[in-house]
């Protein structure tokens, strides 16, 4: 069951050839990871509801199951989110139409924006 979903439109800059992760004009894994992470980031922001805080990506595991054409719409669905203290764990799926193209797990950590940047 979907807790959250977002649709992403693919274009040439999302291709493996353009990114440099492959030679073909298909959706690149790095671009797909970006879509998955963006969906998790947006849902985390809704859950936190504090302008002083944000989340940062800490871990991503993905199974890119099927290639997809550039121009296809990618629907990212978050099926589960758990929260322990500052840590948020997401289970995500990506689809082209109704066909599953990827499954992933992603961890984000809640941080104070100012404190986080001061430590860099």
Residues of each region from the PLM?
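C-terminal output/interaction extensions
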Residues: 109-120
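Hydrophobic beta-sheet segments that form the core/acyl-binding groove
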Residues: 62-97
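Catalytic strand-loop segment that frames the active site of acyl-thioester-processing enzymes
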Residues: 1-28, 43
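Hydrophobic beta-strand-centered segment that forms part of the acyl-chain substrate-binding groove
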Residues: 42-75
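Short beta-strand edge segments in extracellular beta-sheet folds
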Residues: 9-11, 95, 107-111
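Conserved N-terminal beta-strand and adjoining loop/helix that marks the start
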Residues: 30-33, 38-39
């Amino acid at each position: 069951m979907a807790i959250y979903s977002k649709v992403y439109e693919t274009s040439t800059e999302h291709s493996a050839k353009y990114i440099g992760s492959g030679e073909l004009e298909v959706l690149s894994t790095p671009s797909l990871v970006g879509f998955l992470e963006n969906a998790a980031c947006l849902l985390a922001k809704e859950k936190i509801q504090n302008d002083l805080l944000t989340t940062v990506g800490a871990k991503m595991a993905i199974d890119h199951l099927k290639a997809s054409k550039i121009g296809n719409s990618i629907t990212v669905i978050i099926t589960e989110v758990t929260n322990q203290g500052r840590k948020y764990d997401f289970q995500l799926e990506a689809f082209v139409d109704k066909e599953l193209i990827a499954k992933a797990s992603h961890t984000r950590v809640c941080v104070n924006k100012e404190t986080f940047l001061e430590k860099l």
